[in-house]
């Protein structure tokens, strides 16, 4: 019973990052790496972890720049760097084979890991984790696509994006948009996100990652080739009402994955807030060892 309760750790890895992570389940079970997105942390998996820990060994880190992970002063915030830090964590923990649960920013981090360690990936759960241009909903990405045509410190774009990043309402709406009954969403989740993202230096970190996101799109063909070549099983568990990564991004996985299951939920971006039990059941059904 004790194995299903998350244990908390902080460990310094090769690049100087002190990675804070949650761990649960027996180390002898198949490992699933849970990779969160913006603007949250591994806290988004708080309800999923005990549902999976009986069948899996769970590792859920806070990405650099998020949650309680600490970075050195000279850390360069890019998706390449985030991938490198998580790769160091996996090596430090001697984790050789693992499946991934990817969400939002966790998707480009996870797919970079797959390109770096293709033989180590045993499967993917993508919950609103995009790898296709058609999945980029312009209601969210339109302004950022214009920003990418300029330069990172362009004052016009920076001036418009800072209020977006610093307004708590823009965190809350990611939890509420597309959810039929918003009272079903735990307010503690976005309240923690808001508190963490309002810390000193956070706005600059998130601006850098916003600008760098364009480099993820350039890697989409490589991500897709990995899916075709690896033949790994993929579960697409998608909040169908997401206004950041659309259903078109979920459907696009059909082009490159043979061993695929696609499941839609009547909810928004943070599908675990409303459908955690259903998603856990799909993961166990597809990936647990009998």
Curated annotation (Swiss-Prot):
Keyword presence, Disulfide bond: no
Residue ranges constituting the AB hydrolase-1 domain according to the UniProt record: 30-274
GO molecular function: carboxylic ester hydrolase activity; epoxide hydrolase activity
Any Pfam family: Abhydrolase_1
Gene3D superfamilies: alpha/beta hydrolase (3.40.50.1820)
Protein name from the UniProt record: Uncharacterized hydrolase YNR064C
EC numbers, comma separated: 3.1.-.-
Family (UniProt): Belongs to the DmpD/TodF/XylF esterase family.
Keywords for this protein: Hydrolase, Serine esterase
Keyword field contains DNA-binding: no
Name of the top EC class for this enzyme: hydrolase
Active site: 269
A biological process from GO: epoxide metabolic process
Xref: InterPro entries: AB_hydrolase_1, AB_hydrolase_fold, Haloalkane_dehalogenase
Organism of derivation: Saccharomyces cerevisiae (strain ATCC 204508 / S288c) (Baker's yeast)
């Amino acid at each position: 019973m004790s194995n299903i309760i998350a244990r908390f750790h902080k460990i310094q890895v090769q690049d100087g990052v002190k990675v804070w992570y949650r761990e649960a389940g027996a180390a002898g079970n198949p490992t699933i790496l849970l990779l969160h997105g913006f603007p949250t942390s591994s806290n988004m998996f708080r309800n999923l972890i005990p549902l999976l820990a009986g069948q899996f060994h769970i590792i859920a880190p806070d990405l650099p720049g998020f949650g309680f992970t600490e970075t050195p002063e000279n850390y360069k915030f890019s998706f390449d760097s985030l991938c490198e830090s998580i790769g160091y964590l996996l090596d430090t923990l001697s984790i050789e084979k693992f499946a991934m649960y990817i969400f939002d920013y966790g998707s480009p981090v996870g797919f970079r890991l797959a390109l770096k360690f293709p033989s180590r990936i045993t499967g993917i759960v993508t919950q609103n984790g995009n790898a296709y241009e058609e999945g980029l909903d312009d209601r969210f990405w339109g302004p950022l696509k214009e920003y990418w045509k300029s330069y990172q410190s362009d004052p016009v774009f920076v001036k418009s994006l800072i209020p977006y990043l610093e307004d708590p309402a823009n965190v809350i709406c990611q939890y509420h948009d597309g959810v039929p009954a918003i009272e079903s969403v735990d307010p503690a989740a976005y309240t923690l996100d808001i508190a963490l993202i309002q810390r000193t230096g956070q706005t600059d970190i998130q601006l850098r990652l916003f600008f760098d996101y364009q480099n993820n799109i350039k890697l989409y063909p490589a991500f897709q080739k990995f899916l075709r070549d690896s033949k790994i099983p993929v579960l697409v568990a998608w909040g169908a009402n997401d206004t950041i990564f659309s259903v078109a991004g979920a459907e696009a996985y059909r082009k490159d994955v043979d061993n695929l299951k696609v499941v839609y939920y009547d909810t928004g971006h943070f599908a675990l807030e409303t459908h955690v039990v259903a998603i856990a059941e799909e993961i166990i059904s597809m990936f647990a060892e009998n």
